[in-house]
Every structure is written in structure tokens, then in C-alpha cells.
Regions:
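Rossmann-like NAD(P)-binding element
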Residues: 57-86, 91-92, 98
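Rossmann-like NAD(P)(H) cofactor-binding subdomain of soluble oxidoreductases
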Residues: 80-132
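A conserved regulatory-domain signal marking ACT and ACT-like small-molecule sensing domains
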Residues: 281-367
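NAD(P)+-binding Rossmann beta1-loop-alpha1 motif at the extreme N-terminus of oxidoreductases
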Residues: 1-61
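Internal alpha-helical scaffold of NAD(P)-dependent oxidoreductase catalytic cores
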Residues: 139-226
Length: 367
């Protein structure tokens, strides 16, 4: 039976979610809320949604499922608003926030006793692009879509959500909200602090050591890429998960002090063990499997400095969807190849590797 889905927030995540729902459920009516007229117009023009509004409360009573794809503070504010609306009995309310405890706690506080169901959620996908204009039906492919059930989740809710979101081609997983926040503080939130701190430190250092800007490439670029993330979103994330993140900061300070002491003492064995353990631990992690934020599939090609060589590669890959192509101008040991090509899914990556290796003698490396 066709359902009515209401997505509040037509940014990259919300709009991409609408496309994924439409892919598997073309008969579902998708309603959209966004304050921006431009985002609403794009979503309507591209067929992501069927109707749009800038008045959140107006569409909520019509929905069988409501998804709040909004900043954390606004999500909590809208949960409070939903508690005072005449919603359909048994309506499912979910969200797409990057931290979960504050949102789940708010839902259990304000929606308790209401004839609704609530399940927290965090689709771990993203891009450096933003807005409805950047929506991508394949954004969530093979990425983790985390559910954090609450006391209001109820029977069959998760099954209904998995069915609704089947067109996202994501990997669904359930985890406790507090454990979610502990885990993401370490592997997502704290790394953003590190990247931004390293970038800020380098910018100040480069004022006296100008060549630092010119030499920054390879590993530095990889480590600081996420420093370009949207500051408002990350301010909200850190403040909604502050205790756990502060714990990670203190833990890191201790580890950094240990390394500093080893260097000061000239303890070669401790320094070697530090790097070797990190290398072994990284190799043992599932970090090379796709499932996290901003997933892409990268292929590196060592190409000669010849005219039209990039054009030749692109001709071979005609019909393959590329996310990005980058020419590494420096010949550095920490760069896998001169030409870096990024794909959205494993199928395109494998096809590209096959085409290039079969038709050229270039060395191809998959990272």
C-alpha cells in the first residue's frame, strides 16, 4: 500500500534520501519541508518530492513516516512541535542526526504517551557538496545506516524503515544511542577536531615558514580534507556530544605526551613500536571496506607525461560514472599515482581497473 513520507530538510542527505525512496517506491507520495525556496524548487523540479512547504506543521499530520533531516538543535525543536500536532496514529518519526543521545532523549521526553513511534537514525554518508542540487541517489550505497531504537520504537518499526529505505542500498545496523555517540566521537567527531587543529596550526606556522604551504600535499592533504566541513554542523555535533568528545581529547593528550617523551629521551624502540603498532592496527581494521562517511572508491594510475594521456583514459572510461579526477603534480612517495580517479561504487571501480589494465601498460593501484 502506498504511503506518504514527509522529509523535513532538503539538503544533501534529505534530498538524496528522497531519490532513494522514489527508486524503490515510485508510488509513495513524498512531501518536503525546507526554509529555502531554492531548495524546494530544485527538489520539485527534479522529481525528488511531490509537494513542498516552508511551514513544517502543515504537512506533518498527512504523513505515515516523518524523517527529520535537520541540524540537531532544529531536530529537537521539531520533535517538541510534533508532540503538539494531531498526527496519524502509529506514525513513524525518525531523524538523520550525527549524534543520537540528545535526540533520542528528547523524543522519549516529548513524545511519551503519544500514539507515535520513534527510532533514531544516522546515515553515515556525506560529501563535500551540499544542498538539494547535489543530491545523489547513490550517496548511501554500501554506507552504514545506523538505527538507534528507543522505548518508543515499537514492533515492526525497523522492518518498515528498512523497507522504506531499501532503495538507498545502504547497510542497516542497530546500536544503542549512547554507544553510537561513544563510537562516533572517536572515529568521526574527534578526527574533525584533529584535522581542523592541524590546519590551523599549519596556517599560523606558514606565516613564518612560507614553503609549508607549497610542500603540503599527499599525507597532509588526506589528513586535513575534512577540515573543509561545514562549521555550523560540526559546532552542533560537538556541543551535543561534549562529554564523550572531551574524554577523547584528554586521552589523546596523554598519548601525544607519551610520544613526545619518547622523542625527548631518544627512545628508538618506543618510537618504532609506536609507528609499527599503528600500522598493524590500521591494516587489521575494516577501514578499507566502504561503509563510512564520504565513501568513494579511488583508483591511481601512473601515467607518462605525454600529450592527451588523460583524454585517452577518459575515452576508455566512457559510460562510467566518475565522482572526481585529480592530477597529482608532485612525484611523492606518499602518492600512489599521478592520476587519481574516484568512483561512487565498487562496480565502476572494478570496471575502470579492468579497462585500463587491458588497454594500456600503465600501473594501476586501488586504494
Amino acid at each position: 500500500m502506498a504511503k506518504t513520507v514527509y522529509i523535513a530538510g532538503l539538503g544533501l542527505i534529505g534530498a538524496s534520501m528522497a531519490l532513494g525512496i522514489k527508486r524503490d517506491h515510485p508510488d509513495y507520495e513524498i512531501l518536503g519541508y525546507n526554509r529555502s525556496q531554492a531548495s524546494r524548487d530544485i527538489a520539485l523540479k527534479e522529481g525528488m518530492i511531490d509537494r513542498a512547504t516552508d511551514d513544517f506543521a502543515s504537512f506533518a499530520p498527512l504523513a505515515d513516516i516523518i524523517i527529520l533531516s535537520l541540524p540537531i538543535k532544529q531536530t529537537i525543536s521539531f520533535i517538541k512541535e510534533l508532540a503538539n500536532l494531531d498526527l496519524k496514529e502509529g506514525v513513524i518519526i525518525s531523524d538523520a542526526g550525527s549524534t543520537k543521545s540528545a535526540i533520542v532523549d528528547a523524543a522519549e521526553q516529548y513524545l511519551a504517551g503519544k500514539p507515535v513511534r520513534f527510532v533514531g537514525a544516522h546515515p553515515m554518508a556525506g560529501s563535500h557538496k551540499t544542498g538539494a542540487a547535489s543530491a545523489d541517489v547513490n550517496l548511501f550505497e554500501n554506507a552504514y545506516y545506523i538505527f538507534t531504537p528507543s522505548s518508543l520504537t515499537g514492533k515492526d518499526t525497523l522492518e518498515e524503515m528498512r523497507d522504506l529505505l531499501s532503495g538507498l542500498h545502504a547497510r542497516f545496523i542497530e546500536i544503542d544511542a549512547k554507544e553510537h555517540d561513544r563510537v562516533t566521537s572517536q572515529i568521526s567527531h574527534f578526527p574533525h577536531i584533529l584535522a581542523s587543529s592541524l590546519m590551523e596550526q599549519t596556517a599560523v606556522y606558514a606565516q613564518e615558514h612560507e614553503m609549508a604551504r607549497r610542500f603540503a600535499a599527499g599525507g597532509f592533504r588526506d589528513m586535513t580534507r575534512i577540515a573543509e566541513s561545514e562549521p555550523g554542523m560540526w559546532t552542533s555535533i560537538l556541543l551535543s556530544n561534549r562529554e564523550t568528545i572531551l574524554d577523547r581529547i584528554e586521552d589523546f593528550k596523554e598519548r601525544l605526551d607519551d610520544v613526545g617523551q619518547a622523542i625527548s629521551k631518544g627512545d628508538e624502540e618506543q618510537i618504532w613500536n609506536f609507528f609499527n603498532q599503528a600500522r598493524e592496527q590500521r591494516q587489521a581494521m575494516e577501514i578499507h571496506k566502504r561503509g563510512g562517511v564520504d565513501s568513494s572508491y579511488d583508483l591511481y594510475v601512473d601515467v607518462p607525461d605525454e600529450e592527451d594521456v588523460v583524454l585517452r583514459i577518459l575515452e576508455l572510461l566512457r559510460g562510467t560514472s566518475l565522482v572526481n579526477i585529480h592530477i597529482n603534480e608532485e612525484n611523492r612517495e606518499d602518492i600512489h599515482g599521478i592520476l587519481q580517479i574516484s568512483f561512487k561504487n565498487a562496480q565502476d571501480l572494478e570496471r575502470a581497473e579492468h579497462l585500463i589494465t587491458e588497454n594500456t601498460d600503465y600501473t594501476v593501484v586501488i586504494k
